[in-house]
Every structure is written in structure tokens, then in C-alpha cells.
Amino acid sequence: MAKLGTPLSPSATRVLLLGSGELGKEVAIELQRLGVEVIAADRYADAPAMQVAHRSHVIDMLDAMALRALIAQEQPHLVVPEIEAIHTETLVQLEQEQGLRVIPTARAARLTMDREGIRRLAAETLGLPTSPYRFVDTEAEYRAAVAAIGLPCVVKPVMSSSGKGQSTLRSEADIAPAWEYAQTGGRAGAGRCIVEGFIDFDYEITLLTVRHAGGTSFCAPIGHLQKDGDYRESWQPQPMSSAALARAEEISRAITDDLGGWGLFGVELFVKGDEVWFSEVSPRPHDTGLVTLVSQELSEFALHARAILGLPIPVIRQSGPSASCALLAHGEGVPYFNNVAAALRVPDTAVRLFGKPSVHGHRRVGVTLARAETIDEARAIARDAADAIGVELRP
């Protein structure tokens, strides 16, 4: 976009966020800084991005008619999916019928809404290296896939994120409960799953890849620690060989070029020595990229905002060893944070509290961030800051 309007005026540049969690909140803030009129939608009220948007809507984004009605009402210049649980076929239809601009493209949103579309594209169409895998619909197919792939392996619903419904199978005793959890823990309820073999990797990274008007740019690789498929810590830069980094960039460019459009992609990769395997890709900012709030001059959210608006990204500057640590809450209630001051007493630390309206079970409610002389020091400082904050859940 060569021109940007003024919010809440006839000239406004309107962006509709489909999904209003903590990542969408940071995108909304960056768009606000550029004078964009932001509309946030999600399935529940008072979601984090709604708190910083010009207005918001509560809808079931898997409901095709509700999604069409919202887009017709708001007439956005850009639709920016921030989660997977969206009726993406509607976006494809509106893109074809009306020229609706979906970020990065409606096809990319549809392919990445579940693990099957993107895995088949990566492995079967593009020939990228991946773990061995099978897709299954029934418990019998699941058990046959586990037997064929062997233990250890991982089972995940094809439509889920942040570890929901995901289990690691290490013994025969894990097989039955893992299937049960996969059928109850995913975003879209019971259904199709992927069974993946284990890769004996040294570490895993997220390579934030930005497609923009000037070409494709890469952020420094981000290392991360996962537990039960969910992000716990991330750090940047992750040390890796020049050969492995070149291969990671090659794989990331291949998958993002095929998906097309403009915006930031989070490409997840496994690395062992100089070998690299494709794991997953999200066509939007990535939770492990929260570290870029302190590790880069332009965070992943600022990069996404610039890219989707067609603005230049002449350089991506990394600020040195940095780390993030997720702040977790368990139970039921409204989060209340104690000892935030203690977490901020160490120089070069920061805290982001997401503003999630409630917790039901297990939820990430904030993140601590740190810069230091080394990655190990930054990780330790971020962990200590997270430990210092007590999360209390009130009725």
C-alpha cells in the first residue's frame, strides 16, 4: 500500500484480525503505530488484541456464514488470520469472488490451517526432508501407524496448536491415552491425526522468514525449548553451522515462496549437525518469536505489519544474546500478578502480560524477556524473572 489513511475516517486503512490472542495483540499495536484502523475478532470476549483494537467482534470463525457477514460489515482492506481455527474455504471463495486480500494468501491460510495440507506440500510436492509420517482417521489406523513408524513417535491432531492434543509415545502404555487425548484436546474436536516418527536432532529452531515488497529476508535463527508441544523458552541467535543455516534458509525460502504473498512466516526446523528437516510453518508471527520484542530492532510483529502493508524492510538488526520465558497459569479464574517489580530489577529485562481475561486449565499468560552477554545468561535471567512473578487466579 503506497498510502495509509487515518483511523475512523473515510480514508482509513482497515485491517481485520481473525484471532485476537497475545500475538495478534502485538500485531495490532504495530498496526496502530502506522495509523491503521484495527478490527479484532475471536470466539471469546475481551481477548488480548481486542483490548488494543478500534473495535471488536465475538464470532465463531469456523462458521462460514458468520465469517462472511463480518467481512461484509467491516469491508477490510486486509484480512489477517492469527489462528488456525478459521473457515478458510470462505476466505478462498471471497478472494476469488471479490478480490479480498488475505494475508499472506487465502491458499496459504487454508494449507496451514491443518498439518496435513502443509506436510503434503512440503514432503510430497516440494520434496523437502521431513520426519516419517502417516495420517489416520480411526484408532485402528492410528495403532497401525504407530506399529509401522515405531516408538518413540508423536501423535497430533491435524488441527491444533500450542501442544493441544499432542502426545509423545515412548512405550506401549502410552498408545491408548495418547489417542484419547488427541481426540479431545485439539481445537476442532475429534478427528484426523498425524503420527510422526522421531528425528534424532541436536536442536530445533524457528527461522522467521519475511516476504515483503523488497524480496525475502531472514531473522537470526531462534532456538527454543518445548514441553508437551508448547513453547516454554526461546532465545536468539541460536548458534549453528554456516552450512546448516544456509540449508535452513533454502528450505524456508522454498516453502514460503510456494505459499506466496507478503508477511512473516515462522518456519520450524530440526537440525542435526549440518542436516536440516522441515517440521511446520505458520504464515504469521510465531510464539517462539516473542523473544524478538527485545532481540531485534524490529520485532517479528513490526516486520509483519510492514510487510503486509507493502512498506520497506531495508535491514533486520539483531541486538545480541536474548531470551524469553513463558509465564504460565494453571487452574480456573482471572489472572492476578504478584512481584512484577522483582522481575524487573535486573537490567535489560522486560515483562509482557498478555491481558487474557481468564484461565481454564493451563494457559500462557505472559512472557519475561532478557538481554545479556551470552545466551545462557539471558536464559537464566528470563527464567529467574518468570519464577519471581507469582500468578494467582481469582474468581
Swiss-Prot record:
PROSITE patterns: ATP_GRASP (PS50975)
Residues binding N(1)-(5-phospho-beta-D-ribosyl)glycinamide: E22, L23, E82, D287, K356, R363, R364
One GO BP annotation of this record: 'de novo' IMP biosynthetic process
Amino-acid positions noted as binding ATP in the UniProt annotation, renumbered to this chain: R115, K156, S161, S162, G163, K164, G165, Q166, E196, G197, F198, I199, E204
Keyword terms of this UniProt record: ATP-binding, Ligase, Magnesium, Metal-binding, Nucleotide-binding, Purine biosynthesis
Catalytic activity annotation: N(1)-(5-phospho-beta-D-ribosyl)glycinamide + formate + ATP = N(2)-formyl-N(1)-(5-phospho-beta-D-ribosyl)glycinamide + ADP + phosphate + H(+)
Occurrences of domain ATP-grasp (ranges): 120-309
Family matches, as SUPFAM superfamilies: Glutathione synthetase ATP-binding domain-like, PreATP-grasp domain, Rudiment single hybrid motif
Protein name: Formate-dependent phosphoribosylglycinamide formyltransferase
Protein source organism: Stenotrophomonas maltophilia (strain R551-3)
Lineage, top ranks: Bacteria, Pseudomonadati, Pseudomonadota, Gammaproteobacteria, Lysobacterales
